[in-house]
Structure formats: C-alpha cells, structure tokens
Amino acid sequence: MTDLLSRAHADALDAADPLRSLRDAFVFPQHGDRDQTYLVGNSLGLQPRAARAMVDEVLDQWGTLGVEGHFTGPTQWLTYHQLVRDALARVVGAQPGEVVAMNTLSVNLHLMMASFYRPTHERGAILIEAGAFPSDRHAVESQLRLRGLDPATHLIEVEADEPNGTLSMAAIADAIAQHGPRLALVLWPGIQYRTGQAFDLAEIVRLARAQGAAVGCDLAHAVGNIPLTLHDDGVDFAVWCNYKYLNAGPGAVGGCFVHERHANSDLPRIAGWWGHEQQTRFRMDPQFVPSPGAEGWQLSNPPVLALAPLRASLTLFDQAGMAALRAKSERLTGHLEQLIRARVPQVLQIVTPAEPMRRGCQLSLRVAGGRAQGRSLFEHLHAAGVLGDWREPDVIRIAPVPLYNRFSDLHTFVGQVEAWAAA
C-alpha cells in the first residue's frame, strides 16, 4: 500500500502532472548545484524563459526603427498594451474592454478612488478589513484627507472574528449592514495578504450595492492565483500588481479593471493624454475625449519594455488555463497542509482557512515559540535553499505555485522544518 504522504508518492504525482512541462518554461535561482525550492511566487514570480526574447524584440525594434516603432514593426508600441489585454481579461473574468495594464497598484488605486469614491455629507465612509496591506490603508487615508475628511471617523475597519485572525462572511455582512447608510465605498482584497484568506467577492458586492456603496478590490494576491469573475460579480473597479503570480518581473506594470457599466460614464477622473480616444489622440486637441472602458483611465504611454515579460507569462496562462491551474493548486496546497498536520503539527500552526474555497495557493504559518523561533526557522530554510517569505510580526508564507512548483518541493520544505526542529 502506497504511503500517500511519502516522497515516492509525491514523485509519482509529479510524474503524472499534466502541467509538469510548464516548469521548464521558467528560470530558477540556483542553490549550489540545484534549483532553489522556490515557494515564494506570492511575493515575486519566477522569470518566464520567453521574457528575455520578448524584451529583446522590443529592444531590437527600438534600435532598428527608433521612434517609428510606435507605428510600424512586428509589434507597434502604440497598441502594445493591447497585446496583453485579452489574456488579462481571461485571467480576471472580464470583458476585454474592462481591463488595462498600466502604472502600478497603488497609483491605480488612487486613480480609481478619484473616480469611484464620491463622498456626500451623509455617505462618506470607506470600509476595509483590519490589517489591510499598508499601501491600501495609506491610499485610503490620504484620499480621505484630500477631501477634508478625518480617517478616525470615516475609515471603518472590520476586525477579524475567527481564531487565527481570519474573517467570517457573517462579520463582513454585519459591518456592511451596520454602516450601510454611511458607506460610499467598500474596498476589499480578493485574498488577504497576511493570512492567505480568500473572500466571496460576489457576495460582498451584492451586500454593498444593496446599501448603495461602490465596491473596489485589491487583487494583488488573487490575480493568477484563484479564478476570478469580476464582470459577473459586478465589481466597480479592481487593481492589482503583475509581479507575483503573473510573473511580470520586479516592479512590473500593474493592472486595472473598470466594469463595462462605467465604460462611457461621465465619472470624474484624473486624465492624461494616453487615456484620450485613440483615433484622435495625436490631433493634440485640448478637449479630453476618454477612450471607452478601462483604457480611458490611462495617463501616459505604456512602458513597453515592462509589458514584454507580462506578455510572455500570459502566454503560459493561456496554454494551461485557469481551471487546470486552480485544480493543481488545490491539490498542491492540500498536500502541503496534510504534510504539515502529519509531520510537524507541534512546530507549525496553519493560519490560512482549511476550506479550499477560502484560500488560494498560499499557506500562512506561525511557528511555535513565537517570533524569535519563527525567524530562526525562516533563516534556516533560506540557508537550505528553501524560499518562503516573512511577514511581521510572526508569519511565514509558503506558496506552491501550480505553474512551476512540484509536490516534491513540499516534501523538501517539510523535511527542512523537521531538520530545524531536531537541531
């Protein structure tokens, strides 16, 4: 009888994995004479091998054509951002006109809040989760202050109500109902960055819209990780980074979604020339005529060199399909959970919810003994070539990414935890 928690079984799962060839499409950092055990794609995804060729293509076109590369050549820069549009739309469950790759997450969040946060005397509050990613909180507080409002009275935080610091849907629903008449905006993550908890965005949208509030989402840890259905869910706007699960490189261009019901609206916006309607953009008319859809929120011409790695990665997402990636992800993370509970339960506490629908690929882990022990284990793993990441005050995040991680990687991780505990 096969031991389902043995390395031999993990090797068999890897051999039978229909997505196993995708691993070869990525460049792995090295640890001595072997690949690192890279379990930190939730922080920075690996480099797609095709990225170099696509960046070189842009460089070659620049060298050969100069400024003419905007309008001629194999990939005209005028419309280069549209080369990633359709694939991005498939990843987030949107119509092509609802998405655009531009700026970075925090910049896009400010742009979206300038349009969608419309406070009135009666309705000016913003609802977020307690412990939101700091940049989101900074953005929200600064948007409130820009409008002469006090975050102490207009920023509402929903506190965790579950033992490991996670949030029940009931707590979110109660907060929306309690503060509904005051709410102008609900800003919510697809996945909470520290706990790894995934949220039912469709239900949050339903509850918020019933109260008359707009809904925006930070999808930094959700995009490319879990299936998303932004259009059908009715989210007003969403923003994300592309350097985590979408593997577009450090500081990569971000992404933005605007629901099609706002495509031709007269929402106020911070405007720039690249958001002007494409057919008349180069007439340089003084009157701003926005492009329909999300592209109407662009400010400047796209960073083509930064878009090239994203284009390379999205080709792999199309090759695999989100459904197949999610199926493998659930198996990988489930296997990691089983290994931890069976072999190192006295060392690691799993913070992330156990239900597959309430998490993505990431497991957030607390180490018995507190922060000092946690840092000791984290440094041991790093020295052994096993990469996760650390989030204060006491969480190690481990994220088996289905594009390139293997079941055997999880045994390497747990084996190193055992080695540290035995030392």
UniProtKB/Swiss-Prot annotation:
Q: Its Gene Ontology molecular function terms?
A: kynureninase activity; pyridoxal phosphate binding
Give the required cofactors.
pyridoxal 5'-phosphate
Which EC class is the enzyme in? Answer: hydrolase
Catalysed reactions, semicolon-separated: L-kynurenine + H2O = anthranilate + L-alanine + H(+); 3-hydroxy-L-kynurenine + H2O = 3-hydroxyanthranilate + L-alanine + H(+)
Q: How does it assemble?
A: Homodimer.
What this chain does, per the entry, is described as: Catalyzes the cleavage of L-kynurenine (L-Kyn) and L-3-hydroxykynurenine (L-3OHKyn) into anthranilic acid (AA) and 3-hydroxyanthranilic acid (3-OHAA), respectively.
Protein name, UniProt field:
Kynureninase
Q: Which organism is it from?
A: Xanthomonas oryzae pv. oryzae (strain PXO99A)
